[in-house]
Amino acid sequence: MSKSTTIIAFDQHAATTVAAVLLPGQRTPALHTLTSDSPTILRFVERLRRERVVRCCYEAGPCGFELQRALAARQIPCDVIAPSLIPRRPGDRVKTDRRDAGQLAVLYRAEALTAIHIPTDQEEAARDLLRCREDIRADLLRARHRLSHFLLRHGRRFTETTRAWTKRHAAWLQAQRWPRPALEQTHRAYVRAVDEAVGRLQAVDLELRDLLTVEPLPARVERLRCFRGIDDLTALTIAAELGDARRFPTAPSVMAFAGLIPSEHSSGAKHARGPITKTGNAHLRRVLVEAAWQYRHHAFLGPSLQQRQRGAPPPAIDIAWRAQRRLHRRYRCLAARGKPKQHIVTAVARELTGFLWAALTQ
């Protein structure tokens, strides 16, 4: 970084933003408190840019990437910093907004910070919609649990089939009658909550279909759907959460981004590895582990998988087939060694991530 560059670090919150300005040759930044609206921050930065070159940074947080995009639109360099990778002093027990902004400016000039990838507007919109679906799915699960627990407390058990939440189960729920008005109202409220969540989920699923035609997702989804256990929804989630796979130099770097690499505490002659780090993208890790369960079965090209692979690039199809053979063999070897199924599937998901990266970067 040039010695003549002015560093501006922001500690951004909903109402106020602290700006730490570190001028060339100075060791202590000047601190300014601003309102968090973009026009105010832009005017502040433009005033400093008239004097010399500036570079900005701030921690990734709930305020998102709007400030970065507003600065980039005016040709002002701005990095969004990964909070988990900011160096911390073990004995530092004082934390304030002004202190955080000042430390961020000093560390940024020393090039001791790690910037994160900024998704495009389309990638962020797709990611938000997919995460919205996850939230609705969790709401539906909670609503169903509340209804099931209410019925169980009052001795109401569905025994017509072994599966719940089918049409027959819905008819059985509607046929329930209660001796007291309060119980009747409770039952209706719980059923209505389930129906509303189902309706919201179906509406979002319709919106997700439109994403399959919006660039740059279709090309990525086409390659991802060549793999066993990955259909439209899973492929969309991976494509949106991962972004452009070419930004990762190696397959292990993608595995680390998903939090699927093992933790390690080694020193000298001692080598100790522990559970996976879980420090990466939890949404991506979840769908990868779900897809990895499919590789406990023998390698096979079923009709649905053949349909998904139709028209896909031949290199992606070839990588997907090699993944099937390799990952099933890996599953069986680990199972023969007596490993727990959850550990096996996690290991398979880690290797599956490498195959997906290879298919996306061909």
Language-model features, listed with the residues they occupy:
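A detector of single, family-specific signature residues
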Residues: 1-362
